[in-house]
From Swiss-Prot:
Gene: gpsA
Record protein name field: Glycerol-3-phosphate dehydrogenase [NAD(P)+]
PROSITE patterns, A to Z: NAD_G3PDH
Active site positions, chain numbering: K194
NCBIfam families in the cross-refs: PRK00094.1-2 (NF000940), PRK00094.1-3 (NF000941), PRK00094.1-4 (NF000942)
Any one GO cellular component localisation term in the record: cytosol
HAMAP family: NAD_Glyc3P_dehydrog (MF_00394)
Role: Catalyzes the reduction of the glycolytic intermediate dihydroxyacetone phosphate (DHAP) to sn-glycerol 3-phosphate (G3P), the key precursor for phospholipid synthesis.
Lineage: Bacteria, Bacillati, Bacillota, Bacilli, Lactobacillales
Database matches in PANTHER family: GLYCEROL-3-PHOSPHATE DEHYDROGENASE (PTHR11728), GLYCEROL-3-PHOSPHATE DEHYDROGENASE [NAD(+)] 2, CHLOROPLASTIC (PTHR11728:SF1)
């Protein structure tokens, strides 16, 4: 493939990490953000110290604060902005974009209120004549490891196989490998909902529970993620792949995960408002918990872990009391309520 011009919308840790992958593959990368000091730092010092203290970026990676300039003559746009601003940024893109491009996203969340997936938002806000089918790039990936070129394998899902292959071709190299997938709903919901379980896994650690408990919440968390995803139209086998169990393992067991760290702090008795303030970064699992809880209520899907975490985050339930509530639920068969045939 010829070198591509790619706008990466979102200068956070994952946007920066993916920008480096694309740059390593010979593409022209333009990072867009609205923090003027951060954009100047990337251009002048080739660093993004808010997220990476000791990483120097290639000087060919350029940062833009003007969206129209960042999108000028690009071949592809990669959205890596927080879920809560995705619709706003998509509207802005639609206003200034002058030609058809590939649209990809690497965000993980559900929109508050609408409960929409990211691809749904992008489809609604960016006219079809300006884009192909949306590609979801998701899987087990810590930006802290990708930025130092550690081996990472993730999925690229689209309703159009050619679009998924495009994502595969621009990203894949010796340390970063993409597998194509056609289950957009499954890949997106797996990536979003695992953040909820990661908060719970972190809380168990903060409460002092051991590996048995952590394995249990990850496994049972996967079961309820699958239940909700299948009810939304996903393929159940997707949840046993990279974007499902893979992402759940990496996010639910690692100190690199901000969702896990937030849960750990909750388990130690801190309040979520203080945790978010101290971290200074978006904790997607917090807002996703609310959206998933409301969606599960609407679809009548049993999600006891999600419900408990919702009560801890939004109703001031004590985390340890929440664990006991789950343990005291009526006993049942392990595979109850998992309908793999949809």
């Amino acid at each position: 493939m010829n070198p591509q011009k790619i706008a990466v919308l979102g200068p956070g840790s994952w946007g920066t990490g993916l920008s480096q992958v694309l740059n390593d593959n010979g593409h022209e990368v333009r990072i867009w953000g609205n923090n003027l000091e951060q954009m100047a730092e990337i251009n002048e010092k080739h660093t993004n110290t808010r997220y990476f203290k000791d990483v120097v970026l290639d000087e060919k990676i350029k940062a833009y604060s003007r969206l129209d300039l960042a999108l000028e003559n690009v071949d592809a746009i990669l959205f890596v902005v927080p879920t809560k601003v995705t619709r706003l940024v998509a509207k802005q893109v639609a206003q200034v974009l002058k030609h058809k491009v590939h649209i990809l996203h690497a965000s993980k969340g559900l929109e508050q209120g609408t409960h929409d997936r990211i691809s749904t938002i992008l489809e609604e806000e960016i006219p079809a004549q300006l884009r192909g089918e949306i590609v979801v790039v998701s899987g087990p990936s810590h930006a802290e490891e990708t930025i130092v070129r550690d081996i990472t394998l993730i999925s690229a899902a689209s309703n159009d196989h050619d679009e998924a292959k495009y994502a595969q071709s621009i990203f894949s190299n010796d340390y970063f490998r993409l597998y194509t997938n056609t289950d957009v709903i499954g890949v997106e919901t797996a990536g979003a909902l695992k953040n909820i379980i990661a908060v719970g896994a972190g809380a168990l650690h903060g409460l002092g529970f051991g590996d048995n408990a952590k394995a249990a919440i990850i496994t049972r968390g996967l079961a309820e993620i699958t239940r909700l995803g299948v009810a939304m139209g996903a393929e159940p086998l997707t949840y046993s792949g990279l974007s499902g169990v893979g992402d759940l393992i990496v996010t639910g067991t690692s100190i690199h995960s901000r969702n896990w760290r937030a849960g750990d702090a909750l388990g130690r008795g801190e309040k979520i408002a203080d945790i978010e303030k101290n971290m200074g970064m978006v904790i997607e699992g917090v807002s996703t918990t609310k959206a998933a809880y409301e969606l599960a209520q609407r679809l009548e899907i049993d999600m006891p872990i999600t419900e408990t975490i919702y009560k801890v985050l939004y109703e001031n339930l004590d985390a340890k009391s929440g664990i006991l509530d789950i343990m005291r639920r009526e006993t049942r068969a392990e595979n109850e309520f998992i309908n793999i045939n949809k």
